[in-house]
Amino acid sequence: MSEPAENCSPRWKDEAIQNGYIPSYLDKDELCVVCGDKATGYHYRCITCEGCKGFFRRTIQKNLNPTYACKYEGKCVIDKVTRNQCQECRFKKCIAVGMATDLVLDDSKRLAKRKLIEENRERRRKEELQKTVWDRLEPTQEEWDLIRMVTEAHMATNAQGNHWKQKRKFLSAAGVKEDKPEEIGQASMANTPEGNKVDIEAFSQFTKIITPAITRVVDFAKKLPMFCELPCEDQIILLKGCCMEIMSLRAAVRYDPESETLTLNGEMAVTRGQLKNGGLGVVSDAIFDLGVSLSSFNLDDSEVALLQAVILLSSDRPGLSSVERIEPCQEEFLLAFEHYINYRKHKLAHFWPKLLMKVTDLRMIGACHASRFLHMKVECPTELFPPLFLEVFED
């Protein structure tokens, strides 16, 4: 077997090194219009070789043409042999064939152009990298199964499904007035300080739907195997912690900009004022603000379901004994959630972090409601509170 030759390289590479790079728009045998050497492309509006391109650029950038002087009265023939013998005639021929002095950039413009090219190159690199990231982060088969499971759990426990607009009834139809408490009539108002007044009639309407709303949250949780595998005590803590947050989320995603109402439990459409007067006070503002904000997100059922699962499996609820089991469950949903968002809405900048911030908003609503609940117990007759409502929200 013969030994390989030293410095061997493919023939095409040797030819490329010898001939130089030729753009695809040039014929293979195209010649420089200044000196007749092999052309390498359009330079300053003419087809030239690299040598004449560089000569012309240096002449303009350094303003050298006044220093050029021909020894033969400006009548030199310029070709690839004589081009370096007379700079004046070479420059005159550059001008004569049409090379444009205005296309030669000075140092500052050249640096700016180079910077722009580098920035564009870096931008394209990042776009390609981002595209690769999005492509790579499509949910795995296991994550798709998790998404399908939690979506089915949500839809099975979500009152009226996607037909809530057709099925809803406005609270005003039940004879409950709205907005200013003083317009509702003092007879129906609990005797409490201004700003904390509760419309007893509205509150009694809300209590009719609160038990089925809570029951649906519990049913949703019980459809998640990882939740059911937790100790009973931890299940209770998680449900008590997330119940108001999930009910608020379910109401917020049913905000209707046209009527400026939220639909509670898929059936009762209420205004901001009615919800406030019905017992929630300032908490109603937070829920409505969340609804207004979420209306621009156009969340689908899977996104709402995943958001609920993340809220349910919050391992920082006080009193939990199985934090080390709950944390991985929440992480599993978070990762599937992120991949699902990246897969579906990768063209929307910062969509995932903005959506994740809504978890913080919902936690704030839950905390505010816990404080508000103490006032409601003072303001409203005890017999109006459904047993399940008290069981969930009392410490």
From Swiss-Prot:
Cellular component aspect of the GO annotation: RNA polymerase II transcription regulator complex
> Which cysteines link up through disulfide bonds?
none
Q: Which SUPFAM superfamilies match?
A: Glucocorticoid receptor-like (DNA-binding domain) (SSF57716), Nuclear receptor ligand-binding domain (SSF48508)
Binding-site list for 3,3',5-triiodo-L-thyronine: 216, 265
Where does the chain bind Zn(2+) 2?
70, 76, 86, 89
Give positions of the NR C4-type zinc fingers: 32-52, 70-94
According to the UniProt record, which residues make up the DNA-binding region?
32-99
Q: Region Modulating: start and end of each range? A: 1-31
**A Pfam family per the record:** zf-C4
Q: Where does 3,3',5-triiodo-L-thyronine 1 bind?
A: 369
Give the binding site residues for Zn(2+) 1.
32, 35, 49, 52
CDD domains, per this entry? NR_DBD_TR (cd06961), NR_LBD_TR (cd06935)
Enumerate the residues binding L-thyroxine.
216, 265, 369
Q: What is its main location?
A: nucleus
Keywords, comma-separated and alphabetical: DNA-binding, Metal-binding, Nucleus, Receptor, Transcription, Transcription regulation, Zinc, Zinc-finger
Q: Where in the cell is it found?
A: Nucleus
Share an example GO biological-process annotation for this protein.
retinoic acid receptor signaling pathway
Q: What does this protein do?
A: Nuclear hormone receptor that can act as a repressor or activator of transcription. High affinity receptor for thyroid hormones, including triiodothyronine and thyroxine.
* Family the UniProt entry places it in: Belongs to the nuclear hormone receptor family. NR1 subfamily.
Domain note for this entry? Composed of three domains: a modulating N-terminal domain, a DNA-binding domain and a C-terminal ligand-binding domain.
Q: What is the protein named? A: Thyroid hormone receptor beta
Organism annotation: Paralichthys olivaceus (Bastard halibut)
Q: Which gene encodes it?
A: thrb
